[in-house]
């Protein structure tokens, strides 16, 4: 089924910029700023922000841009990311071409030739633990996508390079926004003391977290539901493969929750109403 063409991709709600050579503290500030701007001001879970819901049956219209600069003076690579679910859907190369990861989604864009899921990018989500992350990997990813041209699309090696670059950015920007565990791990790799180590790979628990953002968000939101009179609140259901056994651990793992409707909890309509009433756009 063809994607519904998105609106406002060129009118981002905000733009967050990060210089690849900046400090780990600057990186932490960059990620925290994205979470703060994306949150529904009227919805928190265990003091963690929650995204406003994905509006049903309408084309995506809430976007933000991330500009990643290989050096302070460079123009930078622009990423187009959905503000309702933090999906990376496009990037703009130095020749002004917008490349899209979902065919037909971004007006005027060129399909990159592969999708944005880890299955599309890696062949198997288990391979996430093989992806090296670090400052050099981030710089290489930015350079590869910023320098992409339409002549690269028929080239197998160039397509593979682009897949690897998108995977790196997904982990170091999108997943880092979703998870405090991932952003903390990446910040550690960018720390001056990490010079000898230079790069690192996520472990199995973090891989399970990345693959289970919706499940972990839902599990925490279920504990917020007001119980019937005389009943105690729902206990957090441990997710062993993520290393998350309590609601406190879940809150310490998540950077921002995906909105999920859970029995007895906020409906999509109510959450959207609260979001708009609190000034959300």
From Swiss-Prot:
Q: Which domain of life is it from?
A: Eukaryota
Which GO molecular function annotations are given, in alphabetical order?
Answer: rRNA N-glycosylase activity; toxin activity
Q: Which keywords does the record carry? A: Acetylation, Antimicrobial, Cytoplasm, Fungicide, Hydrolase, Plant defense, Protein synthesis inhibitor, Toxin
Give the GO biological process terms. Answer: defense response to fungus; killing of cells of another organism; negative regulation of translation
- For the modification N-acetylalanine, the affected residues are 2
Q: Name one Pfam family in it.
A: RIP
* One cellular component (GO) term of this entry: cytoplasm
Root EC class? hydrolase
Annotated active site residues, numbered on this chain, are 175
Known function: Inhibits the elongation phase of protein synthesis. It inactivates fungal ribosomes even more effectively than mammalian ribosomes and is thought to function as a constitutive antifungal agent in plants.
Q: What else is known?
A: Three similar RIP 30 isoforms I, II, and III have been described in Barley.
Q: Could you tell me what this protein is called? A: Protein synthesis inhibitor I
Query: Per the UniProt entry, what species is this protein from, by scientific name?
Result: Hordeum vulgare
Q: Which gene encodes it?
A: RIP30
